């Protein structure tokens, strides 16, 4: 099994963190400079990071028994999604953000009375939506990897719910930061979509982030190349 390089994951999660940071500025610019009263009843200006005090749901897509996409060499989407999500969680928490993970281990979050794979997948996705809607969170970000029959495609793609302006801004923020930091030749823009269950039913600002194509063998080879890793880290 090919293991996604740690430096690559660090770059991905840093870009996502920066994007959430930027989006939080857009959501609440007034929170950058708040006011409080000192003991002499004088107004004192205080500052905090834009994500400080925010609650963000990070959704690592798929999970055993549903591994999601898988490359020809055995790299699984579910495992990589979780690695990225845990690192994003760590960065956000260091900045004073409360992070809710839909899953924190290899397993999907289906109900115990689910028996077939189909039942488990349906239960899992509904539970993810439930977490998002009951969390009172500010943002919901779902981490995924892509795979299609054509092998030539590579790069990032972010999706959001049509007609939801805040989700639109969130997805655009993530897409633009990933393009600038990882693949300047990637000219994709965030896309609206309405046939994904999480996108349709999570009520807070939501974006699905497809972090790359497991179907592209050259992209996967690059993940193991030292020079490419160094360029990403730079």
Report the location of each language-model feature.
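Catalytic-site microenvironment of enzymes
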Residues: 1-234
């Amino acid at each position: 099994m090919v293991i996604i390089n740690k430096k690559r994951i660090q770059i991905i999660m840093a870009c996502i963190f920066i994007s959430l940071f930027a989006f939080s500025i857009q959501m609440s610019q007034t929170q950058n400079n708040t006011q409080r009263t000192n003991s002499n009843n004088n107004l004192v200006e205080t500052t905090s990071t834009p994500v400080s005090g925010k609650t963000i749901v990070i959704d690592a897509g798929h999970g055993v028994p549903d591994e999601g996409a898988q490359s020809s060499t055995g790299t699984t989407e579910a495992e990589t999604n979780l690695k990225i999500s845990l690192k994003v969680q760590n960065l956000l928490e260091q900045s004073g953000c409360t992070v809710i993970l839909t899953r924190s281990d290899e397993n999907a979050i289906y109900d115990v009375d689910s028996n077939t794979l189909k039942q488990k997948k349906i239960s899992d996705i509904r539970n993810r939506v439930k977490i998002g809607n009951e969390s009172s969170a500010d943002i919901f970000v779902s981490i995924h990897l892509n795979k299609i029959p054509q092998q030539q495609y590579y790069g990032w793609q972010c999706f959001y719910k049509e007609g939801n302006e805040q989700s639109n801004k969130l997805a655009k923020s993530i897409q633009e930061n990933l393009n600038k930091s990882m693949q300047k030749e990637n000219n994709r823009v965030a896309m609206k979509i309405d046939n994904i269950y999480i996108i349709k039913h999570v009520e807070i600002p939501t974006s699905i982030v497809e972090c790359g194509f497991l179907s592209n063998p050259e992209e996967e080879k690059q993940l193991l190349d030292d020079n490419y890793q160094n360029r990403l880290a730079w």
